[in-house]
Amino acid sequence: MTNDTVNVRYLVDDVAAAVEFYTTHLGFSVLSSAPPAFADVARGRLRLLLSGPASSAGRAMTDGTRPCPGGWNRIHLITDDLDAEIKRLQAEGVPFRNDVVIGPGGSQVLLQDPSGNLVELFQPANH
């Protein structure tokens, strides 16, 4: 491995909508944008590769199965004030998947991007 950047690929239905979501609501910056096929956005050392149906990542597998958005894997963003983030994002119309879950390590909630990919917001217990 040659660098400290963490790259995560999300399959999305609409590249432009995904770029708008991640830059407007979650503080990502655009690295490149070539809709409808692809864009990548970054936040710190996290780089999201947003691949639309027209991208190489959206091509059918050898068995004919087509990759699609969604699922339960997700990026995990840490916040110092989960309640404030939830209120801000709700006011912006961002859809949430669940209510806050509290565990021994902290509190978490899941929100969805325009294609149904999950983003976990997490506040460690010591905050």
Where are these regions (language model features)?
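Short glycine-/small-residue motifs
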Residues: 118-121
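Conserved active-site tyrosine of GNAT-family acetyltransferases
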Residues: 18, 22-25, 89, 116
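Vicinal oxygen chelate
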Residues: 1-7, 29-78, 86-112, 123-127
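Catalytic core of Fe(II)/2-oxoglutarate
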Residues: 11
